[in-house]
């Protein structure tokens, strides 16, 4: 779990840093807990909306779902949008509305903290290593 959290944090910070010129970028790490009896169904909804959003929406930079290794009902989704406008547009799409309405009763807890990079200069190095 610690490695998963570190990887997610580094990804959030590095992508945010790479887009430093775009001060309006929105980065969130959704923290979701799902009722166990709905887990499989929830994961199906989440995977569909994440895939369709990244494929179809230019303003959706990243939707990266992860599942806790210790507790499979705990889901984290790294969300990165090009701007507040892109985020607001995403909320209005059919795939997101289907996900949101279809999973309301499945979600035990939801937090959507907005993230910001701790050290944008150092995080830029991650992209250089990936090339």
What is the predicted function of each stretch?
Residues 4-5, 20-27, 64-71, 100-131:
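Glycine-rich beta-strand-turn "strand-cap" elements at beta-sheet edges
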Residues 25-33, 62-91, 129:
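Short, well-ordered beta-strand segments in beta-rich or mixed alpha/beta enzyme
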Residues 21, 52-62, 80-115:
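An amphipathic, aromatic/His-enriched active-site/gating alpha helix that lines ligand/cofactor pockets
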Residues 11, 46-49, 94, 103-106, ...:
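Alpha-helix boundary/capping residues
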Residues 26-56:
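N-terminal targeting signals for Sec/Tat export/insertion, comprising classic cleavable signal peptides
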Residues 5, 17, 94-96:
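Glycine-rich, phosphate-binding/catalytic loops in enzymes
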Residues 10-18:
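Hydrophobic h-region of N-terminal signal peptides that target proteins for export
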């Amino acid at each position: 779990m610690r490695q998963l959290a570190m990887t997610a944090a580094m990804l959030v910070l590095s992508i945010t840093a790479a887009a430093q010129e775009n001060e309006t970028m929105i980065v969130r790490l959704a923290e979701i807990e799902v009722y166990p009896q709905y887990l499989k169904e929830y994961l199906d909804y989440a995977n569909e909306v994440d895939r369709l959003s990244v494929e179809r929406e230019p303003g959706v930079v990243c939707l990266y779902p992860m599942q806790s290794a210790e507790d499979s009902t705990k889901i984290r989704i790294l969300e990165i949008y090009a701007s507040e406008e892109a985020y607001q547009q995403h909320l209005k799409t059919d795939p997101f509305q289907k996900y949101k309405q279809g999973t309301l009763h499945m979600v035990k807890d939801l937090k959507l903290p907005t993230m910001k990079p701790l050290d944008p200069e150092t995080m830029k190095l991650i992209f250089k290593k990936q090339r």
